[in-house]
A protein has these predicted regions:
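N-terminal glycine-/serine-/threonine-rich beta1-alpha1-beta2 phosphate-ribose binding loop
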Residues: 2-145, 154-169
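Extracytoplasmic/secreted proteins, especially bacterial periplasmic and envelope-associated proteins
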Residues: 54, 58, 80, 84, ...
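Sec-exported extracytoplasmic/periplasmic mature domains
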Residues: 64, 87-91, 164, 190, ...
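Active-site-proximal cap/loop segments of hydrolase catalytic domains
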Residues: 92, 153-156, 164, 182, ...
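A contiguous active-site-proximal alpha/beta segment in oxidoreductase catalytic domains
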Residues: 142, 150-226
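Conserved G/P- and acidic residue-centered "switch" motifs that form tight phosphate/ATP-binding loops
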Residues: 147, 192, 380
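Contiguous beta-strand/loop segments that form the cofactor/metal-binding neighborhood of enzyme cores
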Residues: 184, 196, 201-388, 392-414
Length: 414
């Protein structure tokens, strides 16, 4: 029997809580909002990690910097990555003088069944995000979910329902929301320092391409069938998809997992980096609860670039930034402009300048966004990148890819 994504969600996310919270694909996916008591966890919050690649390692290092958090468990379909993860986290805690013995679970389901784990980091490939996140929410866990939040628009609607009907906290891994430079740029836009915003330029890269990698030998200890889940069977293994590692001698991944660049397995740069930049753009102009009203692919209706149009008149395009040439966002208003990336900040008005403090280390290891998640777990109030925002950002990204694929403009009908 062929597996589609809707049936996949229903069959993989239901068991642990007894009742499935998924419903029909209608509206914006909001369910009844239920809240738990403040700080039901005690002094230490126990965290498990699912999907143990490069991104998860960086994110987890950020979580180890939070004093009331302990990473206690992990799961992955690749055994060597489990071993590497355990060794890395145990070593970090040992240097802090903290006893640690991270448990490896045979599956994410087994990890979620442990009532002593309060929250999970989910950093799998995109096509597993929704199913595992919904299972975690049903199991009573709070969730830190890597971006892009979901693989499809439908999944985002169902994830909103799961969060709200279970009364859980979900933080999307859009770390730029907790970055002081991006926060400053957003504040300047929202305070009208640039006047009325007329145009946004966001640089993040191209949509995905069809899967065309040749087959290579499967590394020992990788369960490729489980990795695939609902994906087409013709997506055979290639070293770039889940890069093999070595523990002795130590050999890291030779690249980021290439699944993100192919339309069968990911959303290309549009969702990979667009999830960051579109998120900041929509936040700044007050559209992160609504999204665009029209998306136009390059070469259609006179559009030179992939274009998003908002009902407040703002036009956003995916194109190179004039000053920095890095992935980032440029806001152009009646009174001037601001251009911000993860390393640079430029503006036409020196009074609006922001000077970055270089703290060293990998960008993803900075703990501010993870601290925001933990703070929300304790307060039971929404974090700064909640599920609805993640859904609207993902929707804008996916609409960009759909418009590119069908080669005509897409307009919102409500």
């Amino acid at each position: 029997m062929a597996i589609n994504r809707r049936n996949f969600l229903k069959t993989t996310a239901m068991g642990l809580a007894g009742t499935l919270v998924l419903g029909s694909c209608v509206g914006n996916g909001k369910g009844a909002k239920k809240k738990l008591k403040t700080n039901p966890f005690g002094e230490i919050i126990n965290v498990g990690a699912i999907g143990l690649g490069r991104q998860c390692l960086s994110v987890s290092k950020g979580f180890t910097k939070i004093t009331n958090v302990r990473i206690v468990g992990c799961a992955d379909v690749y055994k060597d990555k489990c071993t590497r993860y355990v060794n890395t986290i145990n070593e970090i805690y040992a240097k802090k003088g903290i006893a640690s013995d991270v448990t490896v679970y045979e599956s994410y389901e087994a990890l979620l069944a442990n009532p002593d784990i309060h929250a999970v980091i989910i950093a799998t490939p995109d096509h597993w995000h929704a199913a595992i996140a919904i299972a975690a929410l049903n199991a009573g866990k709070d969730v830190y979910l890597e971006k892009p939040m979901t693989f499809t628009i439908y999944e985002g609607q169902q994830l909103i329902k799961a969060v709200r009907e279970n009364g859980r906290i979900l933080q999307v891994g859009c770390q730029q929301r907790s970055d002081a430079a991006f926060q400053h740029a957003v504040k300047m836009v929202q305070e009208g320092k640039l006047g009325k915003i007329q145009r946004i330029k966001a640089k993040f890269g191209a949509p995905p391409t069809p899967y065309d990698l040749p087959r290579t030998k499967l590394p020992e200890g990788l369960d490729w069938d489980k990795w695939l889940g609902p994906l087409p069977l013709y997506v055979h293994y290639h070293d770039d998809m889940n890069p093999p590692i070595s523990l002795n001698p130590v050999k890291k991944e030779h690249c980021w997992g290439a699944w993100r660049w192919y339309r069968e397995t990911g959303g290309g740069f549009t969702t990979d980096w667009g999830a960051h930049m579109i998120d900041i753009a929509q936040w700044a102009i007050g559209m992160d609860g609504r999204g665009p009203v029209e998306v136009i692919p390059a070469g259609v209706d006179g559009a030179e670039y992939l274009t998003w149009i908002y009902d407040n008149g703002v036009v956003m395009t995916e194109e190179p930034l004039p000053v920095s040439q890095e992935n980032g966002v440029r806001f152009e208003g009646e009174l001037g402009w601001i251009e911000v990336t993860r390393k640079q900040f430029h503006t036409s008005n020196p009074d609006l300048m922001f000077v970055r403090e270089d703290k060293g280390g990998e960008y993803e290891e900075a703990p501010a966004h993870y601290q925001a998640f933990i703070d929300s777990m304790i307060s039971r109030e929404d974090p700064n990148a909640p599920v609805e925002v993640g859904h609207r950002t993902c929707t804008a990204c996916n609409l960009g890819n759909i418009a590119h694929e069908v080669k005509h403009a897409i307009k919102r009908d409500q």
